A protein has these predicted regions:
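Polytopic transmembrane helical bundles with strong interfacial aromatic enrichment
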Residues: 2-164
Length: 164
């Protein structure tokens, strides 16, 4: 299928870039937490949580707001996507991922408070990791759905056609 219309192409590129931003940030933040939190001192844990929240605010929070917005604009522009069953699954997984992402942020705030107060953090750590892993699995699944339905392939084709 050949997409026409400049706005749809901009939406497609923006959607693709935001998805990559969120996925890349999620992988980096999860790796940072899993590789260093248990080994860190109390001050190190506080610093790590502040850094994770800061980077999450600047990347994942923005992506989790604008990705659905741009997706809705794409669907408004090309309503035939509402007839594609894979798209319904993609939207469902994306909305669940956004909800669990926000839940993981709440757990991270509780974890930060527990570290500051000196309370046990093991249960909160497990809950945070569980939420983050589910979000990561849903994000990868959503990207896989896009690849399987030629969304990313057409995005790559569009970008390469503009470059040369």
């Amino acid at each position: 299928m050949v997409e026409s219309g400049m706005m749809y192409n901009l939406y497609l590129i923006g959607h693709f870039i935001l998805a990559l931003l969120w996925l890349g940030a999620a992988i980096y933040l999860d790796f940072t937490f899993l590789s260093g939190f248990n080994k860190a001192t109390t001050e190190g844990k506080k610093t790590m949580i502040v850094r994770i929240r800061s980077l999450s605010d600047r990347t994942e929070m923005i992506a989790s707001f604008f990705l659905p917005l741009v997706g809705v604009l794409m669907i408004i522009d090309r309503t035939f996507w509402l007839k594609v069953g894979v798209m319904h699954g993609k939207i469902l997984l994306a909305l669940i991922a956004i909800g669990l992402y926000h839940a993981s942020r709440g757990v991270l705030k509780k974890l930060e408070a527990a570290v500051v107060e000196g309370n046990p953090t093991e249960g909160l750590q497990k809950r945070y990791v569980m939420f983050r892993m589910i979000v990561l699995i849903f994000l990868v699944s959503t990207v896989a759905m896009i690849v399987s339905y030629k969304g990313v392939i057409s995005t790559f084709f569009l970008i390469s056609s503009w470059l040369g």
